[in-house]
C-alpha cells in the first residue's frame, strides 16, 4: 500500500483518502497481530452515520472482543462484504482485502488531524 494518502489513529485504525470525500477504514497490522485470530466482525450498515472517536462496530478474536472506533465523522457508503464469510482477511491483509468500511467524510479536517505513518510507527515503537 502507498501510505502517502493514509492516516492513523491512536486506536490503531488506518484511514485512506480514496479521492473526493470518501475514505476507507481498517485496522493496522499491529492491531491485527495484537488481537490474534479474528473470527467475526460487526460493522455499521450502509447509510449509518458515524461519529469520530465513537464505536461503530466490534471485532471478535479468539482471545478478546474489541471496539472498532470511527476515526472520522460521516456516513457509511460501503462495507466490506467479504468479511462476513472471511473475517480472517483482517489478519491476512489488513491494509488491503481486510478493509472494514468506506465513509463519506463530513469534515476533511478530521482526516488531516490524524497521524501520518512516521508518527504512528513512532507511537508503536517501530
Where are each of the predicted segments found?
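Acidic, low-complexity mobile loops and tails
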Residues: 1-55, 88, 92-126
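Conserved hydrophobic positions within beta-strands
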Residues: 12, 59, 68, 73-76
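Short, solvent-exposed beta-edge and connector elements
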Residues: 35-40, 62, 71-73
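Short, conserved catalytic or interaction motifs in soluble domains
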Residues: 61-64, 81
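Conserved protein kinase catalytic core
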Residues: 66, 84, 110
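Short peripheral tails and domain-boundary helices/loops at the edges of structured domains
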Residues: 73-89, 93
Amino acid at each position: 500500500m502507498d501510505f502517502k494518502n493514509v492516516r492513523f489513529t491512536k486506536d490503531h485504525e488506518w484511514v485512506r483518502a480514496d479521492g473526493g470525500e470518501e475514505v476507507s477504514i481498517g485496522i493496522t497490522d499491529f492491531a491485527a497481530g495484537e488481537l490474534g485470530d479474528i473470527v467475526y466482525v460487526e460493522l455499521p450498515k450502509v447509510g449509518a452515520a458515524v461519529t469520530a472517536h465513537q464505536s461503530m462496530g466490534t471485532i471478535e478474536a479468539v482471545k478478546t472482543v474489541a471496539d472498532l472506533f470511527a476515526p472520522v465523522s460521516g456516513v457509511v457508503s460501503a462495507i466490506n462484504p467479504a468479511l462476513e464469510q472471511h473475517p480472517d482477511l483482517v489478519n491476512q491483509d489488513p491494509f488491503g482485502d481486510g478493509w472494514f468500511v468506506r465513509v463519506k467524510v463530513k469534515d476533511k479536517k478530521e482526516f488531516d488531524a490524524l497521524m501520518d505513518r512516521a508518527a504512528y510507527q513512532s507511537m508503536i515503537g517501530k
